[in-house]
């Protein structure tokens, strides 16, 4: 409970106490700034040391390859051991750099400027990752209900525009947050990040598509697709988050690993039942692309959005389908090799 002085004597005593506290605050803040300067110097020293190590390891690796042909078998084994150790270093450096400031990529530089987005402790990183996952879950549920409303309950172009605007904002926000998470040590496969840029572009084109005969022809199909995709994404989040939790507890996954709108190798154990739902979603994208290209053959076609959306849906299909297929193929190949051993 705060002390409220009443008389002059009490006020003067309170002032003296406040002065002492003020001096203590100044000393603490001065000490804090000094430590920050020390941390900055340590960060610069560590970053430059890692860069120097990388260069020297690269040069050493090339020199060892040249030496292999001119040494005896015993020395070849030594070289192999060194090369194995060299191969492990990039992963260690990656873990170190997750706690060091780094230059933003082109996208983050354009959006945020030269702002340091590296979080310097594990608690902050995990809290940001957890907040990202919750954001995806809440927006997925919202988009599912919004698309259902537009498909079955409301049929106004202005409501469709609000839905598409929400999609643009959602995917834009995802790309920014994912870039920050990558800066902080999350390993997200290239396509699963890039597809969000493609989806942002697609949603933006859908937003600008004027109301007309062709728009109305494609509207219900697009909303049905949106409902299905959001349902699958919710389904994926539910099962992927549980699987990631178990794998982290076993020490088989990194704390900064994320749920994705696709299939990755770590999902092979226990989540293969998701594959039919994913492939159906991929072929839905192909169906949308074909439908839109067929619309360009109609005499009513005059909007550029028809061709652009059709091309974008085909890009999404090819990227999603072949990336997922590649993961499945590599897992089968790995299993065959394991059986052969």
Curated annotation (Swiss-Prot):
Keywords: Cell membrane, Endoplasmic reticulum, Membrane, Nucleus, Transmembrane, Transmembrane helix. The chain crosses the membrane at residues 132-151, 158-176, 190-208, 218-239, 270-293, 304-329. InterPro entries: TMEM120A/B (IPR012926). GO terms for molecular function: coenzyme A binding; monoatomic ion channel activity. GO terms for cellular component: endoplasmic reticulum; membrane; nuclear inner membrane; plasma membrane. It is a multi-pass membrane protein. Pfam families: TMEM120A-B (PF07851). It is found in: Cell membrane; Nucleus inner membrane; Endoplasmic reticulum. Residues 1-131, 177-189, 240-269, 330-341 are cytoplasmic. It comes from the Eukaryota. Residues 152-157, 209-217, 294-303 are extracellular. CoA binds at residues 129, 186-187, 236, 239-240, 282, 331. GO terms for biological process: detection of mechanical stimulus involved in sensory perception of pain; fat cell differentiation; monoatomic ion transmembrane transport. The transmembrane domain (TMD) has structural homology to the very long chain fatty acid elongase 7, ELOVL7, despite low sequence homology between them. Belongs to the TMEM120 family. Homodimer. Multifunctional protein involved in mechanosensation, and plays an essential role in lipid metabolism. May function as a potential ion channel involved in sensing mechanical stimuli. TMEM120A is structurally similar to a lipid-modifying enzyme, ELOVL7, and contains a bound coenzyme A molecule, which suggests it might function as an enzyme in lipid metabolism. This is Transmembrane protein 120A-A. It comes from Danio rerio (Zebrafish). The lineage of its organism: Eukaryota, Metazoa, Chordata, Craniata, Vertebrata.
């Amino acid at each position: 409970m705060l002390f409220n002085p009443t008389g002059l004597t009490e006020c003067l005593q309170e002032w003296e106490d406040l002065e002492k506290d003020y001096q203590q605050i100044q000393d603490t803040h001065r000490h804090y700034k000094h430590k920050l300067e020390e941390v900055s110097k340590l960060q610069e020293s560590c970053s430059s040391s890692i860069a120097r190590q990388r260069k020297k390891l690269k040069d050493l690796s090339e020199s060892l390859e040249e030496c292999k042909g001119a040494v005896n078998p015993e020395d070849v084994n030594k070289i192999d051991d060194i090369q194995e150790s060299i191969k492990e270093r990039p992963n260690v450096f990656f873990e170190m750099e997750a706690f060091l400031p780094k230059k933003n990529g082109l996208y983050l530089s354009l959006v945020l400027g030269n702002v340091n987005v590296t979080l310097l402790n594990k608690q902050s990183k995990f809290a940001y990752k957890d907040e990202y996952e919750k954001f995806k879950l809440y927006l997925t549920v919202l988009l599912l209900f919004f698309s259902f409303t537009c498909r079955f309950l409301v049929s106004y172009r202005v409501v469709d525009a609000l839905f598409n605007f929400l999609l643009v904002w959602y995917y834009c926000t995802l790309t920014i947050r994912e870039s920050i998470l990558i800066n902080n040590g999350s390993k997200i496969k290239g396509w699963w990040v890039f597809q969000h840029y493609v989806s942002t572009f697609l949603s933006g084109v859908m937003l600008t598509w004027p109301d007309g005969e062709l728009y109305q022809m494609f509207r219900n199909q697009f909303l049905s697709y949106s409902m299905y995709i959001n349902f699958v994404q919710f389904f994926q989040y539910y099962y992927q988050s549980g699987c990631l939790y178990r794998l982290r507890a076993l020490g088989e996954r990194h704390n900064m690993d994320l749920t994705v709108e696709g299939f990755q190798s770590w999902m092979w154990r226990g989540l293969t039942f998701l594959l039919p739902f994913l492939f159906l979603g991929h072929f839905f994208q192909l169906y949308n692309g074909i439908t839109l290209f067929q619309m360009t053959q109609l005499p009513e076609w005059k909007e550029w959005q028809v061709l652009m959306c059709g091309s974008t849906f085909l890009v999404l299909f090819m990227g999603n389908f072949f990336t997922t297929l590649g993961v499945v193929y590599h897992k089968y190949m790995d299993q065959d090799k394991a059986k052969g051993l």
